Amino acid sequence: MKTLNHLNKMKASQQKISMVTAYDYPSAKQAQQAEIDMILVGDSLGMTVLGYDSTVQVTLNDMIHHGKAVKRGASDTFIVVDMPIGTVGLSDEEDLKNALKLYQNTNANAVKVEGAHLTSFIQKATKMGIPVVSHLGLTPQSVGVMGYKLQGDTKTAAMQLIKDAKAMETAGAVVLVLEAIPSDLAREISQQLTIPVIGIGAGKDTDGQVLVYHDMLNYGVDRHAKFVKQFADFSSGIDGLRQYNEEVKAGTFPSENHTYKKRIMDEVEQHD
């Protein structure tokens, strides 16, 4: 079973960490079979699998539902579950209640929060025994304000991001995710921090990489970010669906090969 200690040893020995964002049992099972080190159950499931326009409509119960499914599919993988918008940054009592509910109900290894303003929450959650992963740079929950664009691309912004990253580690974050920032900045942060730093759109010099399952396998996704590489093409499944549709309508499916051979109506008629 992958643990935080395992991830820390990987960083110390300069072994790259692989992470995939997945949302259900079959994708998690495949990730574990592929020996992926970490799985993130991201609130991006709102757009990717629930068809919402953003993450705003994703609830804590949604995250618990999908987190449980992922855990069942990849029980030996280090699993992180997002705290969705509206569940953190409230009062200390509400924040910790939501974090504990998510952590306990999913049996995840950590919860993840976005933004540099949550140091107090990270400290309190850590003290309670809940491991927290921090996410800086482009933070999807704030994309309505900051837009989908490169972050940390000025001297001032880069210096602030380094400061924020250090603050996350000091507060107790166990892993840091950096999204859509210059690669040299990501390298500098990775070198300055002792905790694992996972990049997405942050170059190759972070301690690891994360991509969304559906993006990297071209599964039901219309647009791809610059930093996404497609490692397989699941959209070919559409051809299979078309063929199925045609064969059903033509009456050629199911054939004898897909039909049980047992005949029963002769017995029924004899009984009558």
From Swiss-Prot:
The keyword Lipid biosynthesis does not apply. It comes from the Bacteria. It is found in: Cytoplasm. GO terms for molecular function: 3-methyl-2-oxobutanoate hydroxymethyltransferase activity; magnesium ion binding. It catalyses: 3-methyl-2-oxobutanoate + (6R)-5,10-methylene-5,6,7,8-tetrahydrofolate + H2O = 2-dehydropantoate + (6S)-5,6,7,8-tetrahydrofolate. The active site is at 179 (proton acceptor). One of its GO terms (cellular component) is cytoplasm. Binds 1 Mg(2+) ion per subunit. Its cofactor is Mg(2+). Pathway: Cofactor biosynthesis; (R)-pantothenate biosynthesis; (R)-pantoate from 3-methyl-2-oxobutanoate: step 1/2. One of its GO terms (biological process) is pantothenate biosynthetic process. Keywords: Cytoplasm, Magnesium, Metal-binding, Pantothenate biosynthesis, Transferase. InterPro entries: Pantoate_hydroxy_MeTrfase, Pyrv/PenolPyrv_kinase-like_dom, Pyrv_kinase-like_dom_sf. Its EC number is 2.1.2.11. Pfam families: Pantoate_transf. Mg(2+) binds at residues 43, 82, 114. 3-methyl-2-oxobutanoate binds at residues 43-44, 82, 112. NCBIfam families: panB, PRK00311.1. HAMAP family: PanB (MF_00156). Homodecamer; pentamer of dimers. Catalyzes the reversible reaction in which hydroxymethyl group from 5,10-methylenetetrahydrofolate is transferred onto alpha-ketoisovalerate to form ketopantoate. Belongs to the PanB family. This is 3-methyl-2-oxobutanoate hydroxymethyltransferase.
